[in-house]
Curated annotation (Swiss-Prot):
Belongs to the acetyltransferase family. Keywords: Acyltransferase, Antibiotic resistance, Transferase. It holds the Pfam family FR47. The active site is at 176 (proton donor). Its EC number is 2.3.1.-. GO terms for molecular function: acyltransferase activity, transferring groups other than amino-acyl groups. This is GCN5-like protein acetyltransferase Rv2170. Disruption phenotype: Inactivation of the gene does not lead to general growth defects, and the deletion mutant grows to levels comparable to wild-type strain on all carbon sources including stearic acid. Mutations in this gene restore the growth delay in a icl1 deletion mutant. It is an enzyme of class 2 (transferase). Residues 44-205 form the N-acetyltransferase domain.
Amino acid sequence: MAIFLIDLPPSDMERRLGDALTVYVDAMRYPRGTETLRAPMWLEHIRRRGWQAVAAVEVTAAEQAEAADTTALPSAAELSNAPMLGVAYGYPGAPGQWWQQQVVLGLQRSGFPRLAIARLMTSYFELTELHILPRAQGRGLGEALARRLLAGRDEDNVLLSTPETNGEDNRAWRLYRRLGFTDIIRGYHFAGDPRAFAILGRTLPL
C-alpha cells in the first residue's frame, strides 16, 4: 500500500463527507452518531469563500514498478475514491463567523489592544479541522497535510483552536509546536462548550 496526498475540491468533499467524518470521529474518539450531528456544519463550511481541503489516501501500489513507469501511478479517479486516512480543511476568517466572534471576545477579555486584535484578525486562515485515523498516526501525515493545505495561502496568519491537555502531551500539540504555532489565548471556553481550549497561531507562510 502507498499513501498519497490529494486536494479535495468542494464536490469531492461533499461526495466523500461520510468518509471524512468517519476519520474525524475515529481520530477524536467520539461516539458513533457524531457524524450525523456534524455533517450540516461541515457542509456549511464547504460553501464559505476560500474554503480549501486536503486528504491523505491509501492505494495499492506496484512496489516493483520501475520508477519511470508512470503507468504504475494511480489515476485521478483511483485517488479520489481511495480509502481516506486523514483530512484537513479551513477557510479565511471573516466578520460574522461564530469562531471569529468568539476569538475576538477572548482577545478583548485578555486585554489585547484594539489595534493588535485588528492586525491579527483582519487577515488569517482558520485551520478548522485536521484529523488522522488512529492507525495511521505517527507517520508524519498530520504535518504533511497541514503544509499542503497552507502552502500558497495569501493570508498573513493561520489560527486554530485545540483542546487543552495536561502538559501539551499529545500528537496534536506536538505537531502544532513543531510547525511553529504559539499561544494566542490559553484556557478559553467557547460558548456552549465546557472544555478549555487554546487558541494558537503563527504567521504565514510556514
